[in-house]
Amino acid sequence: MDLYNYNDLAAFGGAGNVADVLKAMEAGLQTGMQYNDQINNGGGLKVESLDAYIKVLANRLNQLVVYNEMPKQRIENTVHQYNQLYKYGEEIGIFNLEGETPEETDTQYIRKSIISKFMGVTGQVTDPAMLAKLAGGMNMYTREVQNKTTLLLTLIDTRLTDADSTCIAEQFDGIFRQHMMGVAATDRGSTEGMSTEQILDAYYGSQAVIDAQNGILTDALVEDAADRVVNVYNGYIDRIVSAPVVFNNYVKKFHESKRVVVGMSNSVVGATMGQSVNDIMTQFGKVAVKTDKFFDVRRPIKASATASSPKAPGIPVAGGTKSAVVADTKTNFVLHAGSYGYLVTAKNRYGESAPLKLTDTALAVAANQSVDLQFTAPVGGAYAPTCYVIYRTKKVTALTDTTEYYPIFTIPASMLAAGYDGAAATKVRDRNRIIAGTKSALIYYNDSQINEYLQFGDTRKLDFAITAPSRRFAILNYGTPCLYQPAKICRIINIGDEGLGA
C-alpha cells in the first residue's frame, strides 16, 4: 500500500482535496535539484544535508588476516634462494666398542628457490575532481590512493591461497600449490618425473591432508590435524585459519547443548547466550582461531554467466563426449553418490570466459565412479586461455537457470592434451577430490621458519607523468608467499555443512 492507493477514498473529501494532499506529500520528498528551471513556491530553496563521512561498504584492511599476520622479509632480488635441512643424517648404528671411532654420517640439505611476482593496480583522478569541494573536506586524490591500496592488498590476500603459476604464469604459487608440491616432495623424496595423477594421489593421501567429507569442523578434526603436525612432521601449532562460515558452523554445533538453569542469577534474565570461540585447546597446545573472509574463496556461478573481462578467452568447445561416468577405484564419490551438473570456463591472467555446459541434465554418479569431461580450446579470439576452471554443482535432482556451480579445480591448458588425473588423452577426470561448495582450513605455527611473504618491493605508490588534466598513479607490490616447511602445515579439506543440528 502506498500513498497513491488513497486517491478514491471518500475520507479525504473528494478528488480536489486528495490532489492537494498528494502535492504536499510529494513536495516534502523533492530536493532543490529536482526544481531546476521550474517556477515553484519555495521547494527549490531547500539545502540538502550531506554526512561528512563516507560509509565504507567494502572490506577494511584489518580483515586481511592471512596477509597482515604472515611474517614479512625484504629480499634484494627477484629470485630468492634458501636451504632446507632435510635430514640430520642416516640412522646408523650408534653403539661402539671401547675406544672405537663412531660411524660417520652427513647432514642432508635441499637447495630451493622461489621467484617474486609483480602486482599492481592503476588509479586516476581528474583535475575537476581534485578542485571540487567534497564531503568532509576530503582530498579526492588521497582517498583514491587509499581505495586502490586496499583493493590491491585485498586481491593479494585472496590470491595467497589459490594462485598457481602453472595455470597463469604471471601469478606466484599460492599456499595451496606450495603445500601440495612440498608435501608430495617430503613424503616421496621428490616430485621429479611424477605425473599429475601421482602428485594428486600423494598429496590427498598424505598425513598433511585431512578430508572432512563435507562435514562441519569438529574438535576431533582439529585434534587430528594437531597430531599430524606435531607427531608426524615434527612441527608446532599456534593457529587455525579458515573462512568465517567454517567457524560459524563450528559454534552452531554447541548452541543446542547449552543448559539454562531456571532461578540461577543471570541464567535467564540478563543472560548472555550464544557461543564465541577464540581458541581451541588440543592435546598439543592452544590454537588461536583466525578468520579471514578472503581465505579459500570459491564463488559459484550460473550457467548464464558472462565473461569477466573483454580480454578473457573465448568459450571452450564441447568434445565428442562432454561428460560420462567411469568406474574408478580411486574415486572420492564413495560417500557422495548422486546427481551433479558440470561447467567449464577458459581463463587467462585478464579474466574468465563465459561457461560451457558439460551436462545438459543432471548426471548420476555412483559411489564407485568418477566423471570424465571432454572439451577443447576456444576457436579464434585474440586472447588465448592458459588454464581451464572446472565447476560442479552440489548434489541436485535437476539443473535449472538458478542452479549454482562451484569451482572445484583448475588445470593448465598444457595438460589437457595428455589427459588429467588419470583420464585418457583430451579428457579431464573429476574424482571428487574437492567437494563443491566446501572450504579448507590450515593448522600451523605462524613463524618465519614456516612461512613468509617475501617482499622485493613493499606496497607503494608510483605517480605517472601528467599528460592530461588528471593525475594517474599505480599502487604496486612485488613479492610472493613462501612456505619453507610445507609439511609442518596441516590442511583440512572439504569442510562443509553436514552435521549441523545433529
Residue spans of the language-model regions?
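Flexible, glycine/threonine- and acidic-rich loop/arm segments that mediate assembly and lattice contacts
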Residues: 1-311, 339, 366-371, 421, ...
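Disordered, low-complexity "stalk" and linker segments at domain junctions of extracellular
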Residues: 301-439
